[in-house]
Amino acid sequence: MEAIKKVFEQKKAQDATAFVAFVTAGYPKKEDTVPVLLALQAGGADIIELGIPFSDPIADGPVIQEANTVALKNDIDYPTVLGQIREARQQGLTAPVLLMGYYNPMLAYGEDKAIQDAAEAGANGFIMVDLPPEEAIAFRQKCAASNLSYVPLIAPSTTLKRIQFLASIADSFIYVVSKMGTTGSSANVAVNEELPTILSRIREYTHVPLAVEFGVATRDQFNYVADAGADGVVVIGSRIVNAIKAAGEGQVPQFVENYCREVSGKGEPSRVRSPGAAQRTPSQLTPNAETAKGVENILPARFGQFGGQYVPESLVDALAELEEAHKSAIEDPAFWEEVRSLYTYSNRPSNLYLAENLTKEAGGANIWLKREDLNHTGSHKINNALGQILLAKRIGKTRIIAETGAGQHGVATATVCAKFGLECVIYMGAEDVRRQALKLFRIEMLGGKAWVIPVHSGSCTLKDAVNEAMRDWVTNLSTTHYLVGSAIGPHPFPTIVRDFQKVIGEEIKAQLKEVRGKLPDVVVACVGGGSNAIGTFYDFIPDKSVRLVGVEAGGEGIDGHKHSATLSMGQPGVLHGVRTYILQDKAGQIIETHSISAGLDYPGVGPEHAWLKDSGRADYVVCTDEDALRGFRMLTQKEGIIPALESSHAIWEGVKIAKSLPKDKDIVICLSGRGDKDVEQISELLPKWADKLDWHVSSNAIPSK
């Protein structure tokens, strides 16, 4: 910490601006990191930010994403990064080094140990991109105990109350994001002209130095930021990565040094700065629970230890706006009247159907199907899409983005956008596009305002579609609403999705009471992100006599890694802005998942499900691909109802439970979607499974490939 303070003190005495440089550890090769660190210093870097790679960054542009991916392929993890700092120190690195990254790898390593080991390795502090304020206080105290700095981030959208709080926890400098969007820079784009005003606003609350990041790529841009009153200028790694790419074999350190000299002006005559932003006498604050009140949520943000907002600073204001709009809406009878007025469009209430043949097959409890598959667009997803569209209109958004896996949420979102005349962009993993090609056509058939963008990063599935949608939202906050499809993501998304899906459970309770005069004994739903399941479960949580059963995708079996059984096999962590159960490796990197059903192929789960699991209120079990196919076949052939592959997981487990119960009991299974979308996929898969399932469909009916 003291080394960082000393840099800014020396620069102030020289009437100069500190040069802060960023590079991703392990890029382009593991062995390049130490020479690159030394080259940054030789090129004039006063402080170095060393990026800890993460598999699923949500605020980084394509260049840094690529650097993260390459670094992870080079087996870079937290201990490796610390080893590189040690080696660089031994070879003469004296510049302060800040470790910059996302919280989950540190959480997996162990927060206390991560801080202690960083200090011993020679690091000087941390910049955590997605650490919430309530946790930042404790984290900062731990850092200070090891003489490490915690550097908070402030964005152009940060409110004055939040600036006041963040300024109170800054001990060496504040990292100021000068423009909204993902990381990246361009020599041809001007730095935010409002920068002097932004810096002046922050200085009302602090005397610590301000280092400005985003958009700096050239010496002229560096000088502009310095003249605006910045105490430090951050040259983000995208430009340094491009310099590395331009280098030939063995030339990386020299190219990096040359670029840094060009930007920093090292070796050139000293330059007199233009008068900067006016200095004010800041109010002095001590970080505590009282100062954190400026960043409190107006709706409950956590379910036990799960939930929260683990997001970049640039998203915080948009989430607060959304939270306030949702609270206002759900307290407004006119809003719910408008929602209910659309039930004739979405085909609510959905039927509660007694599956007599399935019940007879099981020989136990009555099996009831909640027919969400009969909704407009073919699944429960329309409930949430309609509710969020009305919210988006309420806050004046004109552009809608969404992620989709099986395509059901994509179709529902594109459909309601067509109805309300809004622009619509759907992100879909390239693998899911392959599995659900007809869904893509159906979305784009809805009109010129709707289109699908295939995502080719990572595993090319739902997880990666969420990443891209998040990045889009960060960049286009003023016009865009991110219509999240499942009960995932940062607060308030899990609450919003639940509030628009809980109609499922409310209807089940009323409908079964009408025909049976009682509550169900068991309710069953499939669980990926968990929207249909939380919608089914929520109204029954206080009813302790009702057993809640969520069915996860067991894939090829949970004894290996090809599954999506997050609650059964995962550990608590942070993914896509929320603390919940996730599937991760020992280093805190998100692992690739597998399910025969695209909609369940996700390595996280809604935080309310995580709480229901840990509290023991709900049980979560797994169903393999094979058993899901058996459930698909069973319902299709016994009832003439073709279920979605996602719902087939719940069908299999529901029948299994029904067999164990007496005939006077009632089990309700949420049939979350219809299987029209999966018929082509089943026809392609069936030859592989035919003998194992003893399911032989005429070869003339199966298209040859």
Swiss-Prot record:
Pathway given for this chain reads: Amino-acid biosynthesis; L-tryptophan biosynthesis; L-tryptophan from chorismate: step 5/5
Q: What is the lineage of its organism?
A: Eukaryota, Fungi, Dikarya, Basidiomycota, Agaricomycotina
Per the record, the domain of life is Eukaryota
Assigned keywords, A-Z: Amino-acid biosynthesis, Aromatic amino acid biosynthesis, Lyase, Pyridoxal phosphate, Tryptophan biosynthesis
What's the source species for this entry?
Answer: Coprinopsis cinerea
Catalytic site:
49, 60
Q: Where is this region: Tryptophan synthase beta chain?
A: 294-705
Q: Where is this region: Tryptophan synthase alpha chain?
A: 1-293
The entry's family comment says:
In the N-terminal section; belongs to the TrpA family.
Pfam families referenced in this protein's UniProt entry, alphabetically: PALP, Trp_syntA
Residue numbers of N6-(pyridoxal phosphate)lysine PTMs: 381
Kindly give the InterPro entries that the UniProt entry links to this protein. Answer: Aldolase_TIM, RibuloseP-bd_barrel, Trp_synth_b_CS, Trp_synth_beta, Trp_synth_beta/beta-like, Trp_synthase_alpha_AS, Trp_synthase_suA, TrpB-like_PALP
Would you tell me the Gene Ontology cellular component terms? cytoplasm
Reaction catalysis annotation: (1S,2R)-1-C-(indol-3-yl)glycerol 3-phosphate + L-serine = D-glyceraldehyde 3-phosphate + L-tryptophan + H2O
> What GO molecular function annotations does the UniProt record carry, in alphabetical order?
tryptophan synthase activity
Stretches the record annotates as Disordered: 266-287
Which cofactor does the UniProt annotation name?
Answer: pyridoxal 5'-phosphate
Protein name, UniProt field: Tryptophan synthase
- EC annotation from Swiss-Prot or TrEMBL: 4.2.1.20
